[in-house]
Curated annotation (Swiss-Prot):
It comes from Staphylococcus aureus. One of its GO terms (biological process) is response to antibiotic. It holds the Pfam family CAT. Its EC number is 2.3.1.28. This enzyme is an effector of chloramphenicol resistance in bacteria. Belongs to the chloramphenicol acetyltransferase family. This is Chloramphenicol acetyltransferase. Gene3D superfamilies: Chloramphenicol acetyltransferase-like domain. PROSITE patterns: CAT. One of its GO terms (molecular function) is chloramphenicol O-acetyltransferase activity. It comes from the Bacteria. PANTHER family: CHLORAMPHENICOL ACETYLTRANSFERASE, SLR0299 PROTEIN. InterPro entries: CAT-like_dom_sf, Chloramphenicol_AcTrfase_AS, Cmp_AcTrfase. Homotrimer.
Length: 209
């Protein structure tokens, strides 16, 4: 996948990037999202919720360059043409989880079929990363389906090198005849401001309606 290098000296975000990159500033925003219609739709069509959410998340990311901006293995700042989801799958027997990646696709049906095939192959491997090699252009997505929450924060001590979003979904719940989902989005302030987080949340909510 193509990685497009950003010239920091001419980048209009240079001042902001340097400030927050040196501060190592990350932050997380958790929003309560209405998934009532999405739940009804996937139930009627026989789909599972998790891959539907993964597909919607990656759709938003791949529409917006800011969420694909990062640092590659050679230490260059830039952005990938697209990101692939690297998502967690729980093993009930061992109580461990695996991280599996599946190639993204604009078609949900095609993505869903690939997701199911990868699940069959790798979910019982009892390895942290059973599907190898893992491409550089992946975005971490996970779900904690046993508990709902109002906030979530994940800290990475990597000297600010990880700039991509991190998504950790909570357990959905019912309220006022609707179904809601705790949806935390964690970003690095060097590349993402509050405006961009709002953009992500609004686009995601529109997709799942």
């Amino acid at each position: 996948m193509t990685f497009n290098i950003i010239n920091l000296e001419t980048w209009d975000r240079k001042e902001y990037f340097n400030h927050y990159f040196n501060q190592q500033t990350t932050y997380s925003v958790t929003k309560e999202l209405d998934i009532t219609l999405l739940k009804s739709m996937i139930k009627n069509k026989g789909y599972e919720l998790y891959p539907a959410l993964i597909h919607a998340i990656v759709s938003v990311i791949n529409r917006n360059k800011v969420f694909r901006t990062g640092i590659n293995s050679e230490g260059n700042l830039g952005y990938w043409d697209k990101l692939e989801p690297l998502y967690t799958v729980f093993n009930k027997e061992t109580e461990n989880f695996s991280n599996i990646w599946t190639e993204s696709n604009a078609s949900f049906t095609l993505f869903y079929n690939s997701y199911k095939n990868d699940l069959i192959k790798y979910k019982d491997k009892n390895e942290m990363f059973p599907k190898k090699p893992i491409p550089e252009n992946t975005v971490p997505i996970s779900m904690i389906p046993w508990i709902d929450f109002s906030s979530f924060n994940l800290n990475i001590g990597n000297n600010s090198r990880f700039l991509l979003p991190i998504i950790t979904i909570g357990k959905f719940y019912s309220k006022d005849d609707k179904i809601y989902l705790p949806f935390p989005l964690q970003v690095h302030h060097a590349v993402c401001d509050g405006y961009h987080v709002s953009l992500f949340m609004n686009e995601f909510q529109n997709i799942i309606r």
